[in-house]
């Protein structure tokens, strides 16, 4: 029997996720999620599939939808359904109506735990499906955008159950956001455009860990990088890392390409597009499709044409043309395969262990946003370091004494 494309993609991911493999051994033996129902809204592709199967192997009943209309891998969706019997509600190219319908169908499992990416699943529970909240022990949030929404809910006093901020764990944002986003964003752009990076002037909007990862990879491939920022501290970092820092409306005039990574809407406005170079490429690495003002650009364009599989060209009122990849949605998944497998191995290991912690400790938690416990963060780091063949020095007793003293000087 010939295995399907999706089955093979899942198998490939499984073979390259060694931290998950280590956790799987214990989960299969201990079944920490026995009797637990999990609703997930994540990018439905191979790495996510392995994470969902890990929870299932740990005893959970899992239902999954996509957290983005364009990010699903249909071959993986099919394999999860047919080969593994997992209820998955997703397809690449969902309409807005389908997207929200699938989130609701996932919540029909009446979850004990929700695992979200971007915050849409959490929002629905807090608005249209509040009846479910009383049975939810808590949940995890994967990404910066979703954490921002959770923090706003917490400040407003409307959060109905504890949520864990997986994004800000060290083994997530230092690796996933920087190395994962840096590589996968350029992979998506190059797949969509087949254009050369070397010699191009590229504006990177935002110099958080995602932005600096993108800028680092662009620099390594020979691009001339300009950074835009609203934070003077991050702007100084960008300058000392060797990049120019300018305002968007100024920088875009010299740019061949703009990549947004901010979590903020309208970073590239219609007015910016008017003064951009002809056929400038606009791509977004953030979660939502509003960092580039695609709706306004489309509404005010004289003509829109699909010029490549993932690229639309907009002719503006002044005759200028701009090329937008994947309707301004996150380019690494809409036009690529997402983060490297080994990066998501770390992120999903954190997710799995934090979900286990939630099951064991939910009765001690309040309606707050919590960090991933430090011992979980360190445990994942230690497993991966060992797999890399790395070794750590150990402090001796004299060094520990020195570390805890105050009276020993020069």
Swiss-Prot record:
Question: So where does NAD(+) get bound?
Answer: 143-145, 177, 206-211, 229, 285-287, 332
Pathway(s) where this gene product acts: Amino-acid biosynthesis; L-homocysteine biosynthesis; L-homocysteine from S-adenosyl-L-homocysteine: step 1/1
UniProt-listed Enzyme Commission number(s): 3.13.2.1
Q: Which residues bind substrate?
A: 117, 142, 172, 176
Write down the required cofactor(s).
Answer: NAD(+)
Which terms under GO biological process does the entry name? Answer: L-homocysteine biosynthetic process; one-carbon metabolic process; S-adenosylmethionine cycle
InterPro entries tied to this protein: Adenosylhomocyst_ase-like_sf, Adenosylhomocysteinase-like, Ado_hCys_hydrolase_NAD-bd, NAD(P)-bd_dom_sf, S-Ado-L-homoCys_hydrolase_CS
- Cellular-component GO terms for this entry: cytosol
Gene Ontology MF: a single term: adenosylhomocysteinase activity
Broad enzyme group: hydrolase
Q: Which Pfam families match?
A: AdoHcyase, AdoHcyase_NAD
Q: Which SUPFAM superfamilies match?
A: Formate/glycerate dehydrogenase catalytic domain-like, NAD(P)-binding Rossmann-fold domains
Provide the protein's localization.
Answer: Cytoplasm
Alphabetized, the UniProt keywords read:
Cytoplasm, Hydrolase, NAD, One-carbon metabolism
Question: Known Gene3D superfamilies for this protein?
Answer: Adenosylhomocysteinase-like, NAD(P)-binding Rossmann-like Domain
The reaction(s) annotated as catalysed by this protein in its Swiss-Prot or TrEMBL entry are: S-adenosyl-L-homocysteine + H2O = L-homocysteine + adenosine
| Textual note on the cofactor | Binds 1 NAD(+) per subunit.
The yes or no answer to whether the keyword Oxidoreductase is present is no
Protein function: May play a key role in the regulation of the intracellular concentration of adenosylhomocysteine.
Family the UniProt entry places it in: Belongs to the adenosylhomocysteinase family.
Protein name (record): Adenosylhomocysteinase
Organism this protein belongs to: Thermoplasma acidophilum (strain ATCC 25905 / DSM 1728 / JCM 9062 / NBRC 15155 / AMRC-C165)
């Amino acid at each position: 029997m010939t295995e399907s494309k999706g089955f093979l993609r899942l198998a490939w991911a499984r073979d390259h996720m060694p931290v998950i493999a280590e956790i799987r051994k214990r989960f299969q033996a201990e079944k920490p999620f026995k009797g637990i129902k999990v609703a997930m809204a994540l990018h439905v592709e191979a790495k996510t599939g392995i994470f969902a199967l890990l929870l299932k192997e740990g005893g959970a009943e899992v239902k999954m939808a996509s957290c983005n209309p364009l990010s699903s891998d249909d071959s993986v969706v099919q394999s999860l359904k047919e080969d593994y019997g997992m209820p998955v509600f997703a397809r690449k190219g969902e309409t807005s109506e389908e997207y929200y319908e699938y989130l609701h169908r996932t919540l029909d499992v009446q979850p004990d735990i929700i695992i979200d990416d971007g915050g849409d699943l959490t929002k629905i529970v807090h608005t249209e499906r509040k009846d479910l909240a009383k049975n939810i022990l808590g949940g995890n949030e994967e990404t910066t955008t979703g954490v921002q929404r959770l923090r706003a809910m917490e400040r407003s006093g409307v959060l109905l159950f504890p949520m864990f901020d997986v994004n800000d764990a060290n083994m997530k944002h230092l690796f996933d956001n920087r190395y994962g986003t840096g590589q996968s964003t350029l992979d998506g752009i190059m797949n969509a455009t087949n254009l050369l990076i070397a010699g191009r002037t590229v504006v990177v909007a935002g110099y958080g860990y995602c932005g600096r990862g993108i800028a680092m990879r662009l620099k390594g491939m020979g691009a001339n990088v300009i950074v835009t920022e609203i934070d003077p501290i991050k702007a100084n970092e960008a300058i000392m890392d060797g990049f120019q820092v300018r305002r968007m409306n100024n920088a875009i005039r010299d740019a061949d390409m703009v990549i947004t990574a901010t979590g903020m809407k309208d970073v590239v406005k219609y007015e910016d597009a008017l003064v951009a170079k002809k056929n400038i490429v606009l791509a977004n690495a953030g979660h939502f499709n509003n960092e580039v003002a695609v709706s306004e650009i489309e509404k005010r364009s004289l003509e829109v044409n699909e010029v490549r599989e993932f690229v639309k060209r907009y002719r503006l009122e002044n005759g200028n043309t701009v090329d937008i990849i994947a309707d301004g949605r996150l380019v690494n998944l809409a036009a690529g395969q997402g983060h490297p497998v080994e990066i998501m191995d770390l992120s999903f290991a954190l997710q799995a262990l934090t979900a286990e912690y939630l099951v064991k400790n939910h009765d001690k938690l309040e309606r707050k946003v919590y960090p991933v416990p430090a011992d979980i963060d360190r445990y994942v780091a230690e497993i991966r370091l060992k797999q890399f063949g790395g070794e750590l020095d150990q402090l001796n007793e004299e060094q520990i004494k020195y570390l805890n003293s105050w009276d020993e000087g020069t």
